[in-house]
């Protein structure tokens, strides 16, 4: 309560402080602090379980070459898959959100938004089996083509996987999974763009795209980035779908289309944890800690990007 | 049996649970459960309470069958088995969270000491109750079976033998028409007892080709990996020229390898798997009721199939609690019974244990007491 | 794929000014041009060795190009860009529909085999091989997810309110930042955390439905906060100021003005959060365990849940593999239907509660 005594807006200082106000503000603040406590609890748990792996001699850690060598390819795999997913999903999601809010006929727009939301409702195990049974085989011709024509890029060096269960496929599966998250939030933000701005733009003779570019996109940018970050968080931490689709476990490589791919941190934990014992468990949890730190770094970067321009928000 | 009243309930949330309970009065197949158990006519003692196990997911299908049969005889026992994995199973048992563990590996010495402490300083039983042959299966047009020596199998999985028309394969299969097709070896991506047993087999029988130490995690870098038995079988089914190792019961329409044992080639079968387990030496320095074995991979015995997964049930000879002792005793004696083994085999495709193993296990089961 | 959705909805009618008369393509011309481009693309792909994917790719590219070029020549640069974007945005929507349709079809195709009365009325209690159902797992999932929602939504929503309406300075930055970090917690870690917490409190052999709810809440709260925050930020300040000017206390302004205005977005946010956790397998297995019978009391013992049920039916099938796979796919189908139903409920609630707008 005391910390909120001096809000930035002068208007709240003029309002009379009633008990209801105090209780409401207090419980809101308590919720925020509670979240910090939970997170601190999770972090403390992670660190305390990871310490044995951090201090163990290198040859005792699974793989025999120390924690760094164990985690490095996993980090690469995690970032590779998530970034690929984000690159594919973000433009598509913005497109979908724009289509639903400003292009689709009014009557069907709500239904269409609902249909895309449906993608978010599908459990990740199902995505995994769909990726394995449908998408991976369907992408095999693309893999062969990419190895033949784009082989000069290290991403497509080949040899092409015969099963299609590659980092490239995983990136696409993850993209489909985070698409509804990004598009749902973008849609929400786009539809809230002030009607006055939009109408003013149209009244000045702007085409629909110019109206969107001038009145909608600047307004919705922070929301889109926020949605993308949520999506990235999901993609970084996605476990079962990656575990089912990816043919992982190889060392660090940028090659997206061969059958030897680096695994991701989360899927590696899921695959190895049930049968792990002793230091193996500690090592896996230490890798979970690394994922935690990666998310931290990614979010710092995202904050920095968002904050470079002033927030465009109704509550400011 | 399931709507037990033993409760840690917080009054505030009772309302929620209450409304949900109102709308749901139990599954249709559960109401008549107590009337259904006619199986154990001789056993008139009524058991109740909890029986909790956790461990290897490899036993999951067999455990479903055992549970169904066991609850037919003892409808009042609250049975559950969490397929959390062997490591988790052993850990939870040692910590006293479960009554017994299912595990693809026997306890190591350190765990054994801890387990004895958990069992009031008493003995621990380890019964090899789930035996499953691991088949080398492949997807090759027009070829249903192949004879392969261990060194050839090792060569295929290391990548040294990369084509199905390799002379090493042809030498053992003069009658087969081997196509010019690249081999795609597929291995498990998860940490599994199956991989552990398979690599142990290759390490022991083809040591000069396969030099990696046996491990539950596939020890070679790269190659095609898939998650779980369903995963590897799925990839092999959809990829021409692929080969993997998996529970023999899951081979389906795929080709199956007969592996070289001594001077003959043995196909995976329940009998051959049970035979090798029976003739394998026990782990030394264990207690009276600890029947952990070292599977004899290098066997030359006729009709013995050396690539088997042996999964144990681990529990105490002496429990603190009378109900726990009675329940474990009743469950284990059902599991090792001919009926129990056959029921599991029908559902899970494992190999029923042999008569002499059963007699051996029976001594341990009879020794279970509370104290 | 994208040929059946109209690429160009009629543009807003431009007033014909006195200065100059705009040249415009006839109403149906863009659609015609687009289809012509698609046909050309199909022809081209037939020449270069036809496959469905290359037909679609060539078709969409050429169709878009045809519309753009024609508009560029007739209507000028600005209008052409507009039409190009229309094509791109529609294509994006079409592309997103492909995996959706494929997924839903796959699940329906595999899941309908066991979508029968037995599946909804029976549990797996003493079922071996064929038959059985997911009655226990469906109710278990409902109970645990509801409990997780009951925990997460108040905390998440209040935090979002705090961030948007009250917080300033360092605490605000800390909470915003760490909520984002929290989205990156791997699900298994959340499960282990809940397990460690309850083990600490109640001893080693504890397995409760509520443990699973806590684990799911750890995953759910950041999603609730993040999406609610975005939505609350969009409520125009004018509304708040108008309410303050009428002498309404701040908390009543939030409850009566801000939240109702944002209710549709809040509903979407919460539904997304539920969808995020309802299919989680790993954290539930380590905390809630797995049983074959029905247990509906989240404060007493193990429970069955749909995702765990589906996962183990899929990955550890017995010899009658098809029966296990059928149950697994049907469980997945039921899971999707559950979330869809939730979605509908959320939408109904928001429609009911949302303030009437002017148009």
Describe these PLM feature segments:
Chain A
Residues 118, 122, 126, 182-193, ...:
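Transmembrane alpha-helices
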Residues 187-191, 195, 202, 271-316:
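C-terminal transmembrane helix and the adjacent membrane-cytosol boundary/short C-terminal tail
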Residues 55-72, 127-176, 247, 256-257:
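Membrane-interfacial helix termini and adjacent extracytoplasmic/periplasmic loops
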Residues 16, 85-116, 129, 302-311:
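Transmembrane-helix boundary motif in ABC transporter permease subunits
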Residues 76, 80-88, 92, 96, ...:
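Hydrophobic alpha-helical transmembrane segments of multipass integral membrane proteins
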Residues 9-27, 46-87, 105, 160, ...:
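Periplasmic/extracellular loop-to-transmembrane helix junction in inner-membrane transport proteins
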Residues 1-31, 302-316:
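Transmembrane alpha-helical segments of polytopic membrane transport and secretion proteins
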Residues 235-278:
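Glycine-rich helix-loop "coupling/hinge" segments at transmembrane-helix boundaries
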């Amino acid at each position: 309560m005391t910390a909120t005594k001096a809000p930035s807006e002068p208007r709240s200082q003029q309002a009379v402080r009633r008990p209801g106000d105090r209780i409401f503000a207090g419980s809101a603040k308590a919720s925020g602090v509670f979240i910090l406590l939970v997170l601190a609890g999770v972090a403390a748990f992670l660190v305390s379980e990871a310490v044995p792996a951090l201090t163990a001699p290198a040859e005792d850690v699974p793989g025999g070459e120390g924690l760094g060598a164990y985690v490095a390819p996993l980090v690469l795999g995690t970032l590779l898959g998530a970034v690929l997913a984000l690159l594919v999903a973000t433009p598509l999601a913005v497109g979908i959100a724009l289509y639903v809010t400003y292009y689709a006929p009014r009557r069907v727009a709500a239904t269409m938004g609902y249909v895309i939301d449906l993608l978010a409702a599908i459990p990740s195990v199902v995505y995994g089996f769909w990726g394995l049974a449908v998408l991976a085989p369907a992408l095999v011709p693309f893999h062969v083509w990419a190895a033949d024509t784009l082989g000069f890029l290290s991403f497509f060096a080949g040899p092409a996987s015969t099963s299609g269960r590659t980092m490239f496929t995983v990136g696409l599966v993850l993209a489909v999974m985070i698409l509804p998250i990004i598009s749902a939030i973008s849609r929400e933000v786009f539809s809230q763009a002030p009607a006055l701005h939009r109408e003013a733009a149209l009244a000045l003779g702007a085409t629909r795209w110019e109206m969107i570019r001038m009145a909608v996109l600047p307004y919705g940018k922070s929301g889109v980035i926020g949605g993308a970050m949520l999506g990235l968080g999901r993609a970084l931490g996605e476990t079962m779908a990656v575990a089912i689709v990816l043919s992982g476990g190889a060392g660090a490589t940028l090659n997206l289309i061969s059958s030897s791919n680096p695994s991701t941190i989360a899927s590696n934990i899921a695959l190895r944890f049930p049968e792990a014992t002793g230091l193996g468990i500690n090592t896996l949890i230490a890798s979970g800690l690394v994922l935690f730190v990666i998310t931290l770094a990614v979010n710092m970067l995202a904050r920095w990007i968002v904050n470079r321009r002033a927030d465009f928000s109704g509550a400011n | 049996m399931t709507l037990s009243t033993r409760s840690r309930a917080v009054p505030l949330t009772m309302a929620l649970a209450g409304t949900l309970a109102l709308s749901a009065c139990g599954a249709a197949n559960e109401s008549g459960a107590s009337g259904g158990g006619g199986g154990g006519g001789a056993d008139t003692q009524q058991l109740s309470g909890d029986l909790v196990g956790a461990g290897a997911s490899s036993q999951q299908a067999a455990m479903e069958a055992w549970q169904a049969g066991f609850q037919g005889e003892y409808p009042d026992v609250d049975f559950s088995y969490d397929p959390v994995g062997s490591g988790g199973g052993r850990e939870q048992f040692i910590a006293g969270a479960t009554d017994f563990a299912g595990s693809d590996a026997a306890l190591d010495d350190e765990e054994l000491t801890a387990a004895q402490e958990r069992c009031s300083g008493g003995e621990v039983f380890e019964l090899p109750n789930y035996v499953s042959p691991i088949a080398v299966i492949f997807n090759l047009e027009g070829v249903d079976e192949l004879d392969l020596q261990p060194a050839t199998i090792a060569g295929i999985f290391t990548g040294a033998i990369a084509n199905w028309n390799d002379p090493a394969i042809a030498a053992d299969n003069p009658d087969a028409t081997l196509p010019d097709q690249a081999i795609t070896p597929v291995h498990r991506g998860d940490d599994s007892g199956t991989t552990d047993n398979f690599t142990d087999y290759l390490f022991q029988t083809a040591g000069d080709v396969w030099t990696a130490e046996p491990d539950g995690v596939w020890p070679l870098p790269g190659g095609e990996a898939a998650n779980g038995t369903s995963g590897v079988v799925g990839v092999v089914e959809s990829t021409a020229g692929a080969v993997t190792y998996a529970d023999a019961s899951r081979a389906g329409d795929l080709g199956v390898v007969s592996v070289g044992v001594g001077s003959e080639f043995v196909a995976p079968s329940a009998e051959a798997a049970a035979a090798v387990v029976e003739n394998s030496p026990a782990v030394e320095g264990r207690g009276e009721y600890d029947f952990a074995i070292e599977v004899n991979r290098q066997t030359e015995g006729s009709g013995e199939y050396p690539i088997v997964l042996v999964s144990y049930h681990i529990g105490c000879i002496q429990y603190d609690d009378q109900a726990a002792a009675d329940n474990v005793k009743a469950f284990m004696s059902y599991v090792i019974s001919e009926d129990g083994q056959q029921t599991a085999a029908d559902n899970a495709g494992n190999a029923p244990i042999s008569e002499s193993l059963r007699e051996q296990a029976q001594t341990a089961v009879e020794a279970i007491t509370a104290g | 794929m994208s040929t059946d959705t109209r690429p160009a909805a009629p543009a807003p009618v431009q007033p014909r000014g006195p200065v100059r008369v705009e040249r415009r393509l006839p109403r149906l011309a863009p659609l015609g041009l687009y289809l012509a481009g698609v046909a050309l693309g199909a022809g081209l792909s037939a020449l270069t060795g036809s496959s469905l994917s290359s037909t679609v790719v060539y078709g969409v590219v050429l169709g878009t190009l045809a519309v753009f070029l024609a508009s560029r020549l007739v209507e000028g640069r600005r209008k052409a860009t507009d039409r190009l974007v229309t094509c791109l945005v529609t294509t994006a929507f079409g592309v997103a529909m492909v995996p959706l349709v494929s997924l839903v079809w796959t699940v329906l195709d595999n899941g309908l085999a066991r979508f029968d009365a037995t599946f909804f009325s029976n549990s797996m209690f003493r079922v071996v091989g064929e038959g059985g159902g997911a009655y226990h797992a469906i109710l278990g999932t409902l109970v645990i997810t509801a409990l997780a929602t009951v925990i997460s939504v108040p905390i998440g929503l209040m935090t979002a309110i705090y961030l948007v309406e009250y917080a300033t300075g360092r605490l605000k930055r800390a909470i915003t930042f760490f909520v984002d970090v929290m989205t990156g917690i791997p699900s298994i870690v959340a499960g282990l955390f809940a397990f460690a917490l309850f083990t600490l409190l109640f001893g080693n052999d504890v397995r409760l439905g509520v443990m699973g709810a806590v684990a799911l809440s750890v995953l759910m709260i950041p999603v609730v906060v993040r999406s609610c925050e975005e939505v609350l930020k969009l409520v125009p300040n004018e509304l708040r100021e108008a309410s303050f000017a009428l002498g309404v206390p701040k908390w009543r302004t939030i409850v009566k003005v801000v939240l109702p205005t944002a209710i549709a977005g809040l509903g979407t946010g919460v539904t997304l959060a539920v969808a995020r956790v309802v299919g989680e397998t790993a954290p539930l297995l380590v905390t809630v365990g797995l049983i074959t019978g029905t247990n509906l009391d989240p404060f007493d013992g193990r429970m069955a849940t749909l995702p765990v049920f589906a996962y183990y039916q899929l990955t550890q099938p017995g010899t009658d593999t098809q029966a296990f796979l059928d149950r697994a796919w049907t469980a997945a189908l039921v899971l999707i239907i559950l979330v869809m139903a939730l979605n509908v409920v959320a939408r109904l609630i928001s429609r009911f509660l949302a303030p009437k707008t002017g148009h």
